[in-house]
Each structure stands twice: as C-alpha cells, then as structure tokens.
Swiss-Prot record:
Entry protein name: Elongation factor 4
Origin: domain of life: Bacteria
Membrane topology: Peripheral membrane protein
Functional summary from the UniProt entry: Required for accurate and efficient protein synthesis under certain stress conditions. May act as a fidelity factor of the translation reaction, by catalyzing a one-codon backward translocation of tRNAs on improperly translocated ribosomes. Back-translocation proceeds from a post-translocation (POST) complex to a pre-translocation (PRE) complex, thus giving elongation factor G a second chance to translocate the tRNAs correctly. Binds to ribosomes in a GTP-dependent manner.
NCBIfam families reported in the protein's UniProt record: lepA, small_GTP
Lineage: Bacteria, Pseudomonadati, Pseudomonadota, Gammaproteobacteria, Enterobacterales
Length: 599
C-alpha cells in the first residue's frame, strides 16, 4: 500500500490538464505509441469536438521510479469548467493529493482558486505545476509568485513542465511520488468502497468506479449496497489503464471498476458505500454533498411517440451525471416532456446534445429559468422553477429571486468595463482586492442575470482575460413579474418569462420583435403580444401572405374589385379562426438572445 498514490489533476479551463494526462500515460507506458491519441481520456465525441473535459476519467499506471521502486499511480483527470465543479469534488474525495496545473502564461484564474480550495478543505496535499513553459508568453516566476499571493500555497519550487513537448514530465512524476502521501486504510478491516461514478453499459448493465477505503474486494464476492441494503455479486472487476483490464482482486487504497449485473439504474447511487454481505462494515463513508441545480428548462420530444425512449435515456444519463434533476411536465403547447435542472447553461447544452446524439432523439428545449421562492398571501412558501407554475399576482405576497456570489479575477486594465457590466446586471459589489496586476472582485448578482449570458459578456468585455466562479448565496425579495406571450390571443405557456419589473417593457418589446422575425408567415395575420397579467405591453404582427386576386381584372369596375377583395378578406378571417401557428425551435430559445443585440 505504501507504493500507491491516488491523485487528481485540477486546473482552470484550457490550462492543459488533459494534455498532461496524455504525457503521464505515455511516460508510464499505459498505451503503445500506436494507441496514443490527443486527449486520450476525453472519450466522448462531444468532449473532443469542444476541446473540453466533461466527465472525470480514471487511470491506473505503473511508474518505475529512478530509485528502482515501482509505484501504482491512480489518477483522475477532471473537468475545469465551472458547470462541472461537482465532478471535481467527487474525484477529489477518492484521492490523497492533487496536481494544481497553472498555465505559465495566463496565471491563476478563478477556477484554479475554487478547485484548489475544494482540495484544501478535503485536506489533500496540493502540488503546484507550472505548465506551458514552452510558450513565448510564459513567465513562470511571476506565476509562481501569483500562486503564493492569491492561492496561498508555497510555489517557490513548483514543478515546471510543458505537457505538449514533454519537458519536465519526469519531474512531475518524481514530485508526485515524493509529496503525495500513500492511502490510509486497513486491508484486514471489513470492506468499505466508495462509489465515485457510475455509467450504463448496454452489455454489462451498470458499471461503477469505486475507491477501496478499507478491506479488499475479490471477484465473486457477495456485496451489499449500504443505503438500499440490496445484495449483488461482484461479477467482474478491474482497473483502467485507460483500457478496461480485468483483475481478480482490488486491494485497499486502489481505484477500479466493478460490474455486478445491476439492471436497475438506481441500484448503486454515486456517493454510496459498498461492503461485503458476510462481514458488513458498521458505518457508511461520508458521501458527496448533493448539488442543487441552478437552471431549469423544459425538454420535450418533437414527436410524442419518443416520450418513452426519452424517459429511459434521461434515466441512463442521470446515472452517469448525478447532478441532473428531472421530473415529468406537460405543456399545452408542447405536450408531455420533462422539467430538467442543470448546473449552468453549458451543462444544459451538453445534456441536450448527448441526448440527441447518444439516444437519437429530437428535442425542443424551452428557455432556461432559475428557481424562485414565493411567499403566498396565506403565508406558505413555494419554490417555482417554471414561469407557468407561478401563482397569480394577487396571490403573491413576496417574490424572492436567487442571488449568486460571483468571484472574478481579472487584469486591472479591464476593471472599469467589468464593473459597468456588473452594475448593468443589477450587481452589488461586496469586495475588491488587488494582487499585483490582478484584481479579485466579488459581486452579488441575481442568478437569472448570471445564468443567461453573464459569462459570455464578461469574456468579451475583458478580451477573455477575466475568469468567473459563482455559487448560490441566498434568496432576496425583488420586484419580479411574469411576462406572458400571446399568439393570436392564446397564451403559449412555454414562452413565458420572469423578469424584473423595470426591464419588463424592454424585454417584452424585444422578445416580441424577435419572435416576429422567427415565426414564418402564414395565410393569415399572426398577432404576437407580450402581457403582464391582462395588461398588454408590446405587440407586433406577422403579416399574412396574400394572393393578388385583382390580377385577372385588367380595367373594369371598382365594385368588382371591392367584391373580390371582400371575399378574400372573409376567407382569411375564417382561416384565422381554425388556423394553427407552428413555432420553430428558435422561437423558444429567442429569449436567450433578448438584450444581447441592443447593447
């Protein structure tokens, strides 16, 4: 056990975690030259295309140190995006140490800080690594100083490497083995194994990634899931090297995979503890704190026949992604679907894309909203995650919106722009600290403003240098109203939005104009209105297509022309009474772009 090292790689987006993982695998001979590919751990097509890591992946490597000892390295490559920070905290729970990778050109960014603090809270040994030293813009000394000033860990002898060229990678391995402590645990104690992650395999059923904290797990053992008490057989187990390799036994301190022929996707929840049926452990291992979704949106299958397939797909995905929340929902405009909760807009995009790709579904997404706390007139508190569930205005005492605490790190040159943006987003400044040329800003901004387009706007006002980390702070009373959209006098529940009363007329006006561009013209006029309660605040009309009925008249009497026009008018009127308006998918997402073009 003293030769096992469990560690994660944590960093901000694009600081080179996945590339460093590739080099470690290559140096330790996990894959042959032929099998090596760039970002070998980003196994999902989606991850490759976007160049981001979405799922944490684990690998077991054997490292022969210069002193002749052979060490077993179990490491987990983690995502860097703020939407996937729960993946990082789960990975860290299985480790004794973490490599904090910092780009020697960019320096410390907000996610570097957030992930590093998560690791420190869990008492992990943090080893700083300065990556990308081959870049012309790299300034390792300045960045090492930044790590000390901002993060507060000693970085004087931080390992310097370039994952792309492979320079300094052996030093990283040496430092790992030296600084990260071996796992603690008792091989003779009753088995306690923590489930770090699970996913669904069409042939094997549920595959779980486990970290053995105490005891040992052998093939064929009867195991018990501690939260549900269900018993299963350990049919197959092994490690990833990144290929799946079968083993007979997983020893204390190791990380490996396990298949127990679990068909029910909720049979072994992530964060649960496994133990042996014949010699159970007394207590459960501390799991993970449940993450609360920040953004809610309705997902509906385009054809109602896909509803069952959609439900199964969501079940399988939620097994792999513990933070996905979903419940059935029905909409008068879109039929049956699910209300889903996500951690952020990127998470929502990724889930929708995975559903459409991996499960071959066609989906319509409604505009994302956040969750509101409503105090009704009879003094009960309800939580509302969809505008259509909001009680009528006369039944509401207080409407409280969620406020996020946003930590931003940015160069001083962009401070003015960023402060202007935060004020425009109804933000309140709570803190500002200067670290050399960097400024750390803390603002409290309503979650609805952060979730929609704050990140994109922050990047564009600071030319990509500012970075953001945010979390839910509290609910606060606010003057919010629901803006309904009526099409030909009928309310479309899927298009409603909740916004601040001061912004409602502008938002309504813009949204209506946007819809007018998106809805195709029909044989009759389509009236699009935005309303607060019964008060119409904006209107626009999609003009009808009409045939020129006078074309065959040439000259002729004016009463003849009037008769033809009158006849056409009556026909259009009849058509309007029975005509349905088909809304394109873009119409439901137009709400996201409201307020972007005008600035």
């Amino acid at each position: 056990m003293k030769n096992i090292r469990n560690f994660s790689i944590i960093a901000h987006i694009d600081h080179g975690k996945s590339t460093l993982s590739d080099r470690l695998i290559q140096t330790c001979g996990g894959l042959s030259e032929r099998e090596m590919a760039a970002q070998v751990l980003d196994s999902m097509d989606l991850e490759r295309e976007r160049g981001i890591t979405i799922k944490a992946q684990s690998v077991t490597l054997d490292y022969k140190a210069p002193d002749g000892q052979v060490y077993q390295l179990n490491f987990i490559d983690t995502p860097g995006h703020v939407d996937f920070s729960y993946e990082v905290s789960r990975s860290l729970a299985a480790c004794e140490g973490a490599l904090l990778v910092v780009d020697a050109g960019q320096g410390v960014e907000a996610q570097t800080l957030a992930n590093c603090y998560t690791a420190m809270e869990m008492d992990l040994e943090v080893v700083p690594v300065l990556n990308k030293i081959d870049l012309p813009a790299a300034d390792p000394d300045r960045v090492a100083q930044e790590i000390e000033d901002i993060v507060g860990i000693d970085a004087t002898d931080a390992v310097r490497c370039s994952a792309k060229t492979g320079v300094g990678v052996p030093d990283v391995l040496e430092r790992l083995v030296r600084d990260i402590p071996p796992p603690e645990g008792d091989p003779a104690a009753p088995l306690q194994a923590l489930i770090i992650d699970s996913w669904f395999d069409n042939y094997l059923g549920v595959v779980s990634l486990v970290r053995i904290k105490n005891g040992t797990l052998r093939k064929g053992d009867k195991i018990k899931v501690m939260s549900t008490g269900q018993l299963y057989n350990a049919d197959r187990l092994g490690i990833f090297t990144p290929k799946r390799i079968d083993r007979e036994v997983l020893n204390c301190g190791e990380v490996g995979w396990l298949v127990c022929a679990i068909k029910d996707i909720h049979g072994a929840p992530v964060g649960d503890t496994l133990t042996l049926a014949r010699q159970p452990a007394d207590k459960v291992l501390p799991g993970f704190k449940k993450v609360k979704p920040q953004v809610y949106a309705g997902l509906f299958p385009v054809s109602s026949d896909d509803y069952e397939a959609f439900r199964d797909a969501l079940g399988k995905l939620s097994l792999n992604d513990a933070s996905l929340f979903y419940e059935p929902e029905s909409s008068t405009a879109l039929g049956f679907g699910f209300r889903c909760g996500f951690l952020g807009l990127l998470h929502m995009e990724i889930i929708q894309e995975r559903l459409e790709r991996e499960y071959d579904l066609d989906l319509i997404t409604t505009a994302p909203t956040v969750i509101y706390e409503v105090l009704t007139t009879d003094n009960t508190t309800v939580y509302v995650d969809s505008p259509s569930k909001l009680p009528p205005l006369n039944g509401i005492n207080e409407l409280r919106e969620p406020v996020a605490e946003c930590h931003m790190l940015l160069p001083q040159a962009y401070l003015g722009n960023v402060i202007t943006l935060c004020i425009e987003k109804r933000g309140v400044q709570t803190n500002m600290v200067y670290h050399g040329s960097q400024v750390a800003l803390t603002y409290e901004i309503p979650m609805v403003e952060v979730v929609l387009d704050f990140f994109d706007r922050l990047k564009s006002t600071s030319r990509g240098y500012a970075s953001l980390d945010y979390g839910f702070k509290r609910f606060q009373n606010s003057d919010m109203v629901r803006v309904d959209v009526l099409i030909n006098g009928e309310r479309v529940d899927a298009l409603a939005l909740i916004t601040h009363r001061d912004n409602a007329p502008y938002r309504g006006r813009e949204f209506v104009d946007k819809l007018q561009e998106l809805i195709p013209r029909q044989q009759f006029d389509i009236a699009i209105q935005a309303a607060i309660g019964n008060h119409i605040i904006a209107r626009s009309t999609v003009k009808q297509l009409r045939k020129n009925v006078l074309a065959k008249c040439y000259g002729g009497d004016v009463s003849r022309k009037k008769k033809l026009l009158q006849k056409q008018k009556e026909g259009k009127k009849r058509m309007k009474q029975v005509g349905n308006v088909e809304l394109p998918q873009e119409a439901f997402l137009a709400i996201l772009h409201v307020g972007k073009d005008s600035k």
